[in-house]
From Swiss-Prot:
Enzyme class of the recorded protein, top EC level: transferase
Pfam families documented for this protein: Methyltransf_10
Stored InterPro entries: METTL16/RlmF, rRNA_lsu_MeTfrase_F, SAM-dependent_MTases_sf
Family matches, as SUPFAM superfamilies: S-adenosyl-L-methionine-dependent methyltransferases
Chief place of localization: cytoplasm
Example GO biological process: rRNA base methylation
The keyword Methyltransferase is annotated on this UniProt entry: yes
PANTHER family per record: RNA N6-ADENOSINE-METHYLTRANSFERASE METTL16, SAM-DEPENDENT METHYLTRANSFERASE
Keywords for this protein: Cytoplasm, Methyltransferase, rRNA processing, S-adenosyl-L-methionine, Transferase
Gene name in the database record: rlmF
Protein family per UniProt: Belongs to the methyltransferase superfamily. METTL16/RlmF family.
Catalyses which reaction(s): adenosine(1618) in 23S rRNA + S-adenosyl-L-methionine = N(6)-methyladenosine(1618) in 23S rRNA + S-adenosyl-L-homocysteine + H(+)
Protein name: Ribosomal RNA large subunit methyltransferase F
Amino acid sequence: MSAQKPGLHPRNRHHSRYDLATLCQVNPELRQFLTLTPAGEQSVDFANPLAVKALNKALLTHFYAVANWDIPDGFLCPPVPGRADYIHYLADLLAEATGSIPANASILDIGVGANCIYPLIGVHEYGWRFTGSETSSQALSSAQAIISANPGLNRAIRLRRQKESGAIFNGIIHKNEQYDATLCNPPFHDSAAAARAGSERKRRNLGLNKDDALNFGGQQQELWCEGGEVAFIKKMIEESKGFAKQVMWFTSLVSRGENLPPLYRALTDVGAVKVVKKEMAQGQKQSRFIAWTFMNDEQRRRFVNRQR
């Protein structure tokens, strides 16, 4: 039986329920994590992070031609459909300049993570080129291992270590480089304690106890920073002004709608020419990203056409 997942982007490959029989053929490890819902339907044991990792491996192989994917224990295991939505809505944003999605776009992923998820999807779906930045050497090593293990990705994805504490674009965007867009899934919490509380809520919601040796948290740089999401994105906005002619669109996920007003004020303060909000929905979960540019319509058209 097939059922639509409400709200996913029209080009998202995950509108239907997971075809678990096919996914288990792609990744036989997934079989051991299958379970039955109260309605008697086959599902995956989403309370088990090993099950989620096995599902991700199958999805990335089946839909995105990523045959070899893994992440170290303790790192976030991203839900693939939601990550794909960001990429597709970003493609729509880039298409506004000329009426078509640029096939050779250059994208900067701030905080590429151990999973390297956004570049993997963006390269397969649109043939884009990615630069991924990361503060964690362990996450960088994991992402590089994924790239090296899959033919063709070395030509499409490059990684850079952010060595400057607190910096986002500084030290990553080199002189004379140009990017069609940046993307980011920023740290959400404002302290380690808040991050631990969030992980504990997730464990409770999944019916787990503290004795379950399962990690739903992620690493510090994935989950929290001083001042939380708003402070991180405001820092990004401040730095973006210095790269106004090198980047067409700066974008970032924003987890809560109530975080938008201070970000809009910050964008006014730096003189952003245009600000866009893209709403997204994955099932019951609502999300969004904001995008801002320092280029007018004609400048953006010229920017996209520069490499045609």
